[in-house]
């Protein structure tokens, strides 16, 4: 009984194990056959799959969601392999997809199904590749647009700088012309004032010279302040004698005192003087007395 009770504390294969250890001294008794080693990460992954916590469809779900950071790498354009479980596209598939993208960057459902059947891929893979390709195309397009706009901006900036310098030059020329016009107008005003003053001085000098050089008139004193009668043309051509000059002065004083017919008498007097200067003066006074009494 005691032996049986003592043997109950040991497993049933205890004796067999000891004999097995004697036959195989290199192997130590452990739980290695039952539990795998957890020293490496891939062993942890295997252990998790062994425990049933990772489903076999999890890799396909990761490929189809496309929300992870390595989604673009999973469906990148190159044909290199980064991992055994990542589905990569070969060069022929990439070329075919590039040609279809050049035809149209929008992917229709029918076109997606045709490409998936032709390339042997899932429709979700085709859609993700087109999304990534459109993103890269938009980025390149933005870079091209930025370069074009930057060149245009540089050109416009250079033209603006040239226009600013030209505008400053024109403003400087305008200011110079304004200053020149002001100085010229001032000089012209001074010249006109000087010429006007010179003309007034010259005219006043001329008047003074005329007044100073004019001979005094004796006729006004003889006629009692009245202006002398106008001279006729006959006097210049037929100058009178001294005797006729005295008679003309007396007759002039006589006719100036008369009221009516003074101008007619003066004309007749001048005509008679002209003829008397040429002929004898014997018949002048009787005719004049007869004219007065008439």
UniProtKB/Swiss-Prot annotation:
Keyword check for Transcription regulation: yes
Give the Polar residues compositional bias ranges: 214-223
Instruction: State the similarity comment.
Output: Belongs to the HD-ZIP homeobox family. Class I subfamily.
Q: What is its main location?
A: nucleus
Show the segment(s) annotated as Disordered: 181-246
What gene is behind this protein? Answer: ATHB-13
UniProt GO molecular function:
DNA-binding transcription factor activity; DNA-binding transcription factor activity, RNA polymerase II-specific; sequence-specific DNA binding; transcription cis-regulatory region binding
Originating organism: Arabidopsis thaliana
Regarding tissue, the record states: Predominantly expressed in leaves and flowers.
* Stretches the record annotates as Leucine-zipper: 142-177
The Swiss-Prot or TrEMBL record marks DNA binding at: 82-141
- List the record's Gene Ontology CC terms alphabetically: nucleus
Q: Which spans does this entry mark as compositional bias, Low complexity?
A: 197-210
Write out the function statement from the record: Probable transcription factor that may act in the sucrose-signaling pathway.
Spell out the Pfam families in the cross-references. Answer: HALZ (PF02183), Homeodomain (PF00046)
Coiled-coil ranges (or none): none
Protein name in UniProt: Homeobox-leucine zipper protein ATHB-13
Task: From the Swiss-Prot or TrEMBL record, state where the protein is found.
Answer: Nucleus
Keywords from the named record: DNA-binding, Homeobox, Nucleus, Transcription, Transcription regulation
Which InterPro entries has this protein been placed in? HD, HDZip_class_I_plant, Homeobox_CS, Homeodomain-like_sf, HTH_motif, Leu_zip_homeo
One biological process term from GO is: response to sucrose
